[in-house]
């Protein structure tokens, strides 16, 4: 056993996260990878993929020096990509050849050489753009199509948030000459019965510059709200007085009927600009025309997005500090009763109790006042006040993403505190100082995980019948890689084991919380249920994370216990309020 422990500790010491530096190259040179080792970028990863899983996949290829899954600095959630570094350069091409597009947790990964220098990544030499791709074409099939022209550094089909192809992609060749050969051969070719367009990739900055140039010198005009009885001659006569027209088209459907819009192209920009200025919103044959610069579809979508975002921000600013969130409402409270409860504190612009699809109250609602001062007064007076036998919770309404960010920051702060304790204990042990490492307890949602619930509770599997959570029974955790690898020397024996338990508990808790929150959509409930489940032995928690059915069973039991706990709290609060009222009488 001691030999195994020593070997594991030795592996952990060797497996440290190191940043690989790229060699200096000139503009004329193709970026080269390091010859002393191999650094790979692994993308398209499922959010729960860990360093340990990647180690299991890549270690058979060669000796792994480090693995790092990149994570959000605040939420610690995976960003969907990682870096894998090998000691030997030969392992890099071998990993790309054998593992590229391998399924990892149901998603094909994308592997390419890591290029640390951003200027070389953004230079774009040898990078081509392909559009009008068939939805069935994925990264692998695109790579197979273009690999015949030369060595490919990266290949990617753009997808939406659901993983569905957006119809375009990019292929980055090592040599620019290979990219030009690919363009010449594939542009206009049929791929899955669709003709594709292939060209050198143009950077966003250059595209924006060209777009601004087109805007400044446009000659093509878009016209809509055209009367169905308008003839081609009338259409041309309307615009012809502003300058020479090179083309004028009234769009028609398959039956030859006008679709209500058309295009007019002038010979020069001045004529087009004058037509837009004078004819936009002009009434023609009883309809108000829209006349503007003709835009491509992506331009219109961008403008619509900007308008939507501006309207959203304006709405948020309008309700900032005046909209209240009220929860723990009794089922008997409707919109009118909610408004009556808050009417004494000021002018109410709206009051709404949220309901499900069957019309039943969801137990919370919103009250909007005319001024922030009125809203603040209502919070002071109504928060925790008993209404219809229930203590209300009243606070300023926040968007869901704001609440999540605040919770993530709180978790991050607790994590940093634990790390500080761990580092202090490690430093003391290295210096030979006496003392015992005692990590601070980790509570989710502000409740200790072993709070006993009063009354008969639904029993969770493997828990004692008194309703209290069992004591922690962490076994020795297995090797940890990347972000879990210890840095430097750590306390030995019991202190070392305690440190590993703390790190393991943190990692499991963060993964478990995400799954529980997805089920509850409630920060408080998710935190407390996570705390209850997390107190099970680590191996059992790992099984829950890997088995959704088993997790659902434990979640339902913990959720029932949590609901009972909440009901008991509310009953106690109501009894206390009634006793206080009797005392006053």
UniProtKB/Swiss-Prot annotation:
PROSITE patterns in alphabetical order: PABC, RRM
Molecular function terms, GO-annotated: molecular condensate scaffold activity; mRNA 3'-UTR binding; poly(A) binding; poly(U) RNA binding; promoter-specific chromatin binding; ribonuclease inhibitor activity
Keyword Repeat in record: yes
Compartment(s) where it occurs, according to its Swiss-Prot or TrEMBL record: Cytoplasm; Nucleus
Cited Pfam families: MLLE, RRM_1
Keyword Nucleus: yes
Record-annotated RRM domain positions: 38-116, 126-203, 219-296, 322-399
InterPro entries, sorted: Nucleotide-bd_a/b_plait_sf, PABP-dom, PABP_1234, PABP_HYD_C, PABP_RRM1, RBD_domain_sf, RRM2_I_PABPs, RRM_dom
Any coiled-coil regions, as ranges: none
Chief localisation class: cytoplasm
Assigned keywords, A-Z: Cytoplasm, mRNA processing, mRNA transport, Nucleus, Repeat, RNA-binding, Translation regulation, Transport
Superkingdom per UniProt: Eukaryota
Family from the record: Belongs to the polyadenylate-binding protein type-1 family.
Physiological role: Binds the poly(A) tail of mRNA. Appears to be an important mediator of the multiple roles of the poly(A) tail in mRNA biogenesis, stability and translation. In the nucleus, involved in both mRNA cleavage and polyadenylation. Is also required for efficient mRNA export to the cytoplasm. Acts in concert with a poly(A)-specific nuclease (PAN) to affect poly(A) tail shortening, which may occur concomitantly with either nucleocytoplasmic mRNA transport or translational initiation.
Name of the protein described by the UniProt record: Polyadenylate-binding protein, cytoplasmic and nuclear
Source organism of this protein record: Eremothecium gossypii (strain ATCC 10895 / CBS 109.51 / FGSC 9923 / NRRL Y-1056)
Gene (name only): PAB1
